[in-house]
Amino acid sequence: MYTLAGYESFWAFLLIASLVPVLAVGTSSLVAPSSKAAEKRTSYESGIEPMGESWIQFQIRYYMFALVFVVFDVETVFLYPWAMSFQQLGVLAFIEALVFVLVLIIGLVYAWRKGALEWS
């Protein structure tokens, strides 16, 4: 029979970890002074008066670069623990990591061929 008896500390930590941000945001919204002045609604550009529209659309290529960065950043997060315990894991873990990296390389080559990484 499956039981949740051994997970009290996990649930307590999860509850506390969920309540802390909610309480912090709620407290700051209640305590913080609110100002409706026009100066507060303008965008900040390094102390210079804003010129033009503050809402501009970024081209899609920026999002593609950000997406590729996130994919390879997550790859690094997954491969670091594997590299730290490489000797204990054996050949099967090496093959699994190799397949993981190959799938990512295939995805990178596909994005490259489709022109997703072209700047112009």
UniProtKB/Swiss-Prot annotation:
Its main location: plastid. One of its GO terms (cellular component) is chloroplast thylakoid membrane. It catalyses: a plastoquinone + NADH + (n+1) H(+)(in) = a plastoquinol + NAD(+) + n H(+)(out); a plastoquinone + NADPH + (n+1) H(+)(in) = a plastoquinol + NADP(+) + n H(+)(out). It is a multi-pass membrane protein. GO terms for molecular function: NADH dehydrogenase (ubiquinone) activity; quinone binding. It is found in: Plastid, Chloroplast thylakoid membrane. Keywords: Chloroplast, Membrane, NAD, NADP, Plastid, Plastoquinone, Quinone, Thylakoid, Translocase, Transmembrane, Transmembrane helix, Transport. It holds the Pfam family Oxidored_q4. Its EC number is 7.1.1.-. NDH shuttles electrons from NAD(P)H:plastoquinone, via FMN and iron-sulfur (Fe-S) centers, to quinones in the photosynthetic chain and possibly in a chloroplast respiratory chain. The immediate electron acceptor for the enzyme in this species is believed to be plastoquinone. Couples the redox reaction to proton translocation, and thus conserves the redox energy in a proton gradient. Belongs to the complex I subunit 3 family. This is NAD(P)H-quinone oxidoreductase subunit 3, chloroplastic. It comes from Zygnema circumcarinatum (Green alga).
